[in-house]
Amino acid sequence: EMRPSGGNRLRLVFYAPTRGLIGYQGELLTDTRGTAIMNRLFHAYAPFKGEITGRRNGVLISNEQGDAVAYAMWKLEDRGPMMIEPGWKVYRGMIVGEHTRDNDLEINVLKGKQLTNIRTTSKDEAVRLTPPIKMTLEKALAYIQDDELVEVTPKSVRLRKKLLDPNDRKREERRKEAETATA
């Protein structure tokens, strides 16, 4: 139900499962440029009504362990927005960004610029990166898929694949495809 609430405001009343509201407050504030106020009240228990669709894009997964390099991240920006900053420690299987397509992509954020002894009159320009997506615990829980986990430490919230090894992930994916084909 939608009705006026005075002072150029609207009041929306709707029923939604709690699992569907995880991560929605941040999205609502973004959509309304911080002007929305959200209040939740328990209405009733209800039977399961089906899956709630999550994100549709894949993720960018680190394929090496080490410190992220700004130059490598700059070269990979066209693949999708990053969730890490240069200098962050990454490991194999860690999610470092969101892919622009619907599949997961293994990337190397450690590859530095090839240096030469040749000097030029034009200096190398400083790499300018798009600010990374900041993950809060609520946002991370809403973001992950079934094959992903959230790591919470006192200093950071990180996302990773359940299976860190890419070969294990491919094997598991093939096994699931075989199960659905026989079912």
Where are these regions (language model features)?
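Accessory interaction regions appended to the cores of large information-processing enzymes
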Residues: 1-183
